[in-house]
């Protein structure tokens, strides 16, 4: 599966694209929420670093 690598509060994180629930654009950044073992995690990645699967989820909404 495809994963998204991002930094959140200075910490490197990686999340599987299948766990991502909601995706939206903020300027040139792609923000998203994901299922973090029952909790809701948040993340953001620049548009140029986002995998194409994440961009496809953005287009579908």
Swiss-Prot record:
<comment type="subunit">
    <text>Monomer.</text>
</comment>
<feature type="compositionally biased region" description="Basic and acidic residues">
    <location>
        <begin position="45"/>
        <end position="61"/>
    </location>
</feature>
<dbReference type="GO" id="GO:0004521">
    <property type="term" value="F:RNA endonuclease activity"/>
</dbReference>
<dbReference type="GO" id="GO:0005737">
    <property type="term" value="C:cytoplasm"/>
</dbReference>
<dbReference type="InterPro" id="IPR003212">
    <property type="entry name" value="DNA-bd_7a-e_arc"/>
</dbReference>
<keyword id="KW-0238">DNA-binding</keyword>
<protein>
    <recommendedName>
        <fullName>DNA-binding protein 7a</fullName>
    </recommendedName>
</protein>
<comment type="function">
    <text>Can constrain negative DNA supercoils. May be involved in maintaining the integrity of the genome at high temperature.</text>
</comment>
<dbReference type="Pfam" id="PF02294">
    <property type="entry name" value="7kD_DNA_binding"/>
</dbReference>
<comment type="similarity">
    <text>Belongs to the 7 kDa DNA-binding/endoribonuclease P2 family.</text>
</comment>
<dbReference type="InterPro" id="IPR016197">
    <property type="entry name" value="Chromo-like_dom_sf"/>
</dbReference>
<keyword id="KW-0963">Cytoplasm</keyword>
<feature type="region of interest" description="Disordered">
    <location>
        <begin position="37"/>
        <end position="61"/>
    </location>
</feature>
<dbReference type="GO" id="GO:0003677">
    <property type="term" value="F:DNA binding"/>
</dbReference>
